């Protein structure tokens, strides 16, 4: 082997070897244990970022480790290729989304190969290809036939100037990103899939996902939001209209003092017909899109309708208000307000001087003070007529029973989860396979006309989808009748909800999935991706799997057994103030810093000599210009170094702080391993290790080796604490560096140690380990080498080093047999000269013995 570690040479050679040998190509082998490891597929944005590198390195480490355990390992990759960014880039670059996307895929594919990830490239998919989305379209038509797909009107962001629908990210401060026109909310027909039909399954099956992070499962439980309560009907005074609300707190029902309805509620429209001020307020509410997450912190606004509801149990009139915090798409679009016992209702009532009626006592039996806030705890009822004195459970049931008995209430289980709206008024997506006949009938596109192919040779004007601006595209015939195609495209979460299953049979053309292949590989054994996907992608991913199961395509209930959510990658962020006081962000690569003795940045200057302000560590992003290009780092240090740093710098699920000094440290370690291997191989071949004749020092080193193997095996396989696995290997290499290399047995032990270290490092740094394995004359390629197994007998200690204290002060150390009794240890201690002199002429009054570690003799 060459003396110097040159990653640029060995990495290219090893990658070529993998490509020529098709090392990572796999097929189904029914007699062999399978392992399916998958990282979330990337969007082909143009270049990999460090977040990608971290995600895919984790997946590759797990895949290579499992392969060394003898399993048939599938690790595929593909491209989540549809989406809005391609449309913006196409307009900006005066091209179409397709060529921009395919060029990005080619570039990023090469970047992935440079990082040495062991993918089966024969299984690569791009979700924008018709041979992929045709089956998605086919499946949608089957869901429609089963009654799981429907169309209804739903609100979208509408730019009246461009006459187009805008995605949420295209609305900036309430205005169109392109022309700055104020955006309106508009109701248009859209397609939905009934995810609510699977709400209970999605909730209950979370309990079976024992190897998913608790945080993800909690987020999904909250998103599904199962609640038990009562749906209650109010009569509207002086009207035949009725008003329905849902509550999980019927115990507070006697404290209702007003009812709030959404701006889109029919009663709101009815009241606004003769009330221009109310009509304006409703328009304001409907044109302001508020994310549900912001509901708690936004300013609560409302306006009285002039209508009243009749409380069904006490007959009192309660005012009906339109409120901006009530959403039409949630529940019934109306809520009963109990300001005495709900903080939001209290704030609204206080703002508009509405009545507040307490009906729940404090825990000590006193009446609550509602002057500063609502009393939201559960307790015994008062002010509630026949229900006074009842506790929460008794009151819940008594009031619910009374409402049911009177025919104005119904016990219901409700879900926060809403059906999945899959229509997008964009071009770059899979066309929705539905057509409208001349008589207005809407039917699925017949199977023999699938796929409905998205035209790729289009001109983007940045305003209207080419599918909508070209009426000829929509024209088709079905059974000889003229028909119009749907011009909306699928939400891109559709493609990423089933790609993992298509990887099992990407070339299969007889159906959506090849049952034999899908059921051999599925479920995924290990899924790796960011926690930001917890309630969108990961919910749809689980839902789609259950849909495919119920269609007979797969047999498992869940798509992935184990989930690892890697943390974000952070980097230093710097800026200076521009001429208008705005922050101009400077790349950390272009900044020189001075640090204090604790390593804190105290001064920073950019490469133009400007003082810049340090804004701390933040997530790598384009907006803060603090992304580090992985390719630059690979060219500078090698892929193995970048991979090693990514796995060592932080636990996988925690944030990782990018520090180039840490990358340099990883590089130094690999150079040290290379140098130790080089010096060892330069001395020629080694003899066989004779375990029976090892000295105590040699036994100690071999014990450390096999303890390290046991720890690294557990850290990678069970605990997934990859950073501690690497730390253990580094510690072992430090011990090896200090070990003598004089005798044949010394060198034989070094050979055993290096062969084990190279295999343990291989999942992290495969290129250098491939090369070192050959230099050390390991059997075959390391790609097919087995994972090292800890020798239990080597880890057994023949002797123990015991510290001897007299009256708590250390007076000596003795070596005793590992199984020595306390009496034997005391005898041996008494023979130790340094100890014996402190025992001369005194009486041992007490003995404290910690087996195999410490002997403390208390004398007097």
UniProtKB/Swiss-Prot annotation:
An example Gene Ontology CC term for this record: cytosol
Chain ranges for the short sequence motif 'HIGH' region as given in the UniProt record: 42-52
Similarity comment: family membership: Belongs to the class-I aminoacyl-tRNA synthetase family.
CDD domains membership: Anticodon_Ia_Leu_BEm (cd07958), LeuRS_core (cd00812)
One term of GO molecular function: leucine-tRNA ligase activity
HAMAP family: Leu_tRNA_synth_B
Annotated Gene3D superfamilies: 2.20.28.290, 3.10.20.590, HUPs (3.40.50.620), Isoleucyl-tRNA Synthetase, Domain 1 (1.10.730.10), Valyl/Leucyl/Isoleucyl-tRNA synthetase, editing domain (3.90.740.10)
Name listed for the protein in its UniProt record: Leucine--tRNA ligase
One GO BP annotation of this record: leucyl-tRNA aminoacylation
Keyword ATP-binding: yes
Known EC number: 6.1.1.4
